[in-house]
Curated annotation (Swiss-Prot):
Residues 2-187 are annotated as: Large ATPase domain (RuvB-L). Its EC number is 3.6.4.-. This is Holliday junction branch migration complex subunit RuvB. The gene is ruvB. The lineage of its organism: Bacteria, Bacillati, Bacillota, Bacilli, Lactobacillales. ATP binds at residues 26-27, 68, 71-73, 134-136, 177, 187, 224. It comes from Lactobacillus gasseri (strain ATCC 33323 / DSM 20243 / BCRC 14619 / CIP 102991 / JCM 1131 / KCTC 3163 / NCIMB 11718 / NCTC 13722 / AM63). Keywords: ATP-binding, Cytoplasm, DNA damage, DNA recombination, DNA repair, DNA-binding, Hydrolase, Nucleotide-binding. The RuvA-RuvB-RuvC complex processes Holliday junction (HJ) DNA during genetic recombination and DNA repair, while the RuvA-RuvB complex plays an important role in the rescue of blocked DNA replication forks via replication fork reversal (RFR). RuvA specifically binds to HJ cruciform DNA, conferring on it an open structure. The RuvB hexamer acts as an ATP-dependent pump, pulling dsDNA into and through the RuvAB complex. RuvB forms 2 homohexamers on either side of HJ DNA bound by 1 or 2 RuvA tetramers; 4 subunits per hexamer contact DNA at a time.
Length: 339
């Protein structure tokens, strides 16, 4: 069976090299410039102001939520608001405890260490963080054989900002050491429209207001998807010679890209059709779904499910996942018969 993810998804929220380049050019510098996530922003504004008044490092921050919602961007904004440097890495990149020790030893007082995908830290690496986060020291084992001994190394007060799409996979000892925990939510259409309008200025292109709204509606509540779709729709508009991206061109180009009015792409539709046609709409176990689409269960839960759940196309039950009436109607199937 062909893997549903053989081709990169235009609406996939996972980052690629082009996204990282785009996001760097669009990155706001201050909380006031950061669009959306109002609850998170208002709370962080207070925490940052209090830390600066006390002349202390900001408490450790955990940002969690689906991919593409601006966790990395917010980490950079927080560091900028605090007036400190940020050192960025990721869980998979820190392969051994010594790698983390090297990063920590380079920090100055108040600096931010940002670890993306923090749930993927190896256990020995994570354990080094415990004393570093709580008491700002690490113990380094030096020597060999009978001369082996631990050296107590103090660290300057610093802020760890961790980002994760899988908060439930964090161990309790690590999670409990974060004083600030913020849940990043999907963006509203209004906020996405503002992001699209702002991005269009950076991209040196114009977009009609109704076209921006249509693009926002199909962007899956995710700024990364909105910016990616804006770039593709801009290509269509430029080839047509439009001075500003029109609603008609937006609808036409998204139709060709197979992104429907709910933001579903062919991958979403394949997954939902598989559940409907092969399993009567469910419930279907997560392992069965993963086997049918050629992915592992983590990818299903982290990449495919969040938006489908949030939009009400599937439900999660103790017996597995079920397709909703809304999904049947969206895909053109007769209404699901009541059991």
């Amino acid at each position: 069976m062909k893997d549903v993810n053989d081709e990169e998804r235009i609406i996939g929220a996972e980052s690629n090299e082009e996204d990282e380049t785009i996001e760097l050019s669009l990155r706001p510098q201050l909380l006031a410039q950061y669009i959306g996530q109002d609850k998170v922003k208002s709370e962080m504004k207070i925490y940052i102001k209090a830390a600066k008044q006390r002349d202390e490092a900001l408490d450790h921050v955990l940002l969690y939520g689906p991919p593409g919602l601006g966790k990395t961007t917010l980490a950079f904004v927080i560091a900028n608001e605090m007036g400190v440097h940020l050192k960025s890495t990721s869980g998979p990149a820190i392969e051994k405890a010594g790698d983390l020790v090297a990063l920590l030893s380079e920090l100055n007082p108040g600096d931010v260490l940002f670890i993306d995908e923090i749930h993927r830290l190896a256990k020995p690496v994570e354990e080094v963080l415990y004393s570093a986060m709580e008491d700002f020291y690490i113990d380094i084992v030096v020597g060999e054989g009978q001369t082996t001994h631990a050296v107590h190394v103090p660290l300057p007060p610093f802020t760890l900002i961790g980002a994760t799409t899988r908060a439930g996979q964090l161990s309790a000892p690590l999670r409990d050491r974060f004083g600030i925990i913020e849940h990043m939510q999907y963006y509203s259409i209004d906020d996405l429209e503002k992001i699209i309008q702002r991005s269009s200025v950076v991209f040196n292109t114009k977009i009609d207001p109704e076209a921006a709204i249509e693009l926002a509606r199909r962007s899956r509540g995710t700024p990364r998807v909105a910016n990616r779709l804006l770039k593709r729709v801009r290509d269509f508009a430029e080839v047509k010679g439009e001075e500003a991206i029109s609603l008609a061109t937006t609808k036409h180009s998204l139709h060709l890209l197979e992104v429907d009015d709910e933001g579903l792409d062919q991958t979403d539709r394949k997954l939902l059709r598989m559940m409907i046609e092969n399993y009567g709409g469910g419930p279907v176990g997560i392992k069965t779904i993963a086997a049918n689409v050629g992915e592992d269960t983590d990818t299903i839960e982290e990449v495919y499910e969040p938006y489908l759940l949030q939009k009400g196309f599937i439900t999660r039950t103790p017996r597995g996942r079920s397709v909703t009436q809304k999904a049947y109607l969206q895909l053109g199937y007769p209404p699901k018969k009541a059991e």
